Amino acid sequence: METGLPFAFKQETRKLMGEQLWKVLSDNIDEPPVTSVRLNMPKCGNLRIVTTVAHSPVAWCRNSYYVEKRPNFTLDPLMHAGAYYVQEASSMFVEYCLDYALETLRKDGLESPSLVLDLCAAPGGKSLILRDTLPASCLLFSNEPIRQRANILAENIIKHGNPDVVVTNNYA
């Protein structure tokens, strides 16, 4: 299958991955991307949105679904109202990791964090997951060093409706 990737890249990747994994990659790289969404439960608790947008659940992230056919999200007022967030399923894995970390802290007799920093937060998917997963008493700072991206981050955080997130635009 022709992937449009540079020949040298394909050769090196094939060598690193081995023939079996390379075949899986090359067979799937030209497939249309899979779309997924994360529901904002306080805004769509009745789950009616699941039947209109979502298809099958993302295994590692609560309230997340694959979309069978990608709609025109920019025309959907529910998306603009923050009822759901369009997000790549692999980036939702942060919820699974955070759940594990919080459970480990609990088992070790340590307190949950009271302050968390998302250092490069735009466009906001990770921050939204962090805010939904962290204890209510935890304050989240979502920083984005690039001004234009920080504006998008702020807009997405506002849409989601969490007042306990501070959006900043700072370099380390």
Residue positions per predicted region:
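S-adenosylmethionine
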Residues: 1-172
